[in-house]
């Protein structure tokens, strides 16, 4: 289970999320109570372990500017949280190692999410960062995509959300804060633990899928 702690504004909170077992740390560059400057984030990511996926979150920024910031300060991923077109998302993905495309729950574009050519698709509440929970039945995994579930998640409901939706990953902002822009260590720890536990329970309940043997020697070169 991929766990992303987003809305991080300080080195202290970034290192806290890492210590608690997060896979990814998100930094918001769009106007928000949690907005941080690229220069500040550049200093923070230098101090994080190399295995952590560092993500810049953008809303309606030009594709060129997204690539410039991500690559310029050493981030590993971009999260596009605006009205980007499939062509813009693909253009960014050709130049950035990992891209997440976010959609509001119920948005018609989700049906064509695969056209964006990104690494994962996020389904969020209609008001991102509001802490509002939406109807999880609206968060079906788009065909051929990895789903990251966001929107109103917190330590007490993330397990239920994972059990119902069965996403590839989860993302949290307000649900692990003591106040906007500041993470609460106990909440971060509890959130990561609950997400991991829910994923393990799903694996234990599900029967393994039988995979037919594959003869690599018979593979036809493309």
Predicted feature locations:
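Conserved N-terminal beta1-alpha1 strand-loop-helix module at the mouth
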Residues: 1-222
């Amino acid at each position: 289970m991929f766990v992303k702690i987003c809305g991080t504004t300080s080195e202290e909170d970034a290192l806290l999320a890492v210590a608690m077992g997060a896979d990814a740390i998100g930094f918001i560059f769009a106007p928000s109570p949690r907005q941080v400057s690229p220069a500040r984030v550049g200093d923070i990511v230098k101090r994080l372990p190399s295995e952590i996926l560092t993500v810049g979150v953008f809303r309606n920024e030009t594709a060129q500017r997204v690539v410039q910031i991500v690559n310029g300060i050493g981030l590993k991923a971009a999260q596009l949280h605006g009205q980007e077109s499939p062509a813009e998302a693909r253009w960014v993905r050709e130049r950035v190692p990992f891209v997440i495309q976010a959609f509001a729950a119920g948005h018609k574009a989700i049906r064509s999410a695969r056209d964006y050519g990104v690494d994962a698709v996020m389904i969020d509440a209609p008001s991102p960062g509001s802490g509002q929970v939406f109807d999880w039945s609206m968060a079906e995994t788009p065909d051929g995509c990895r789903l990251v579930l966001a929107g109103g998640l917190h330590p007490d409901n993330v397990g239920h959300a994972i059990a119902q939706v069965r996403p590839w990953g989860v993302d949290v902002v307000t649900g692990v804060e003591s106040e906007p822009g500041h993470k609460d260590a106990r909440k971060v720890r509890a959130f990561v633990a609950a997400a991991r536990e829910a994923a393990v329970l799903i694996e234990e309940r599900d029967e393994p899928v039988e995979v037919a043997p594959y003869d690599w020697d018979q593979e036809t070169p493309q």
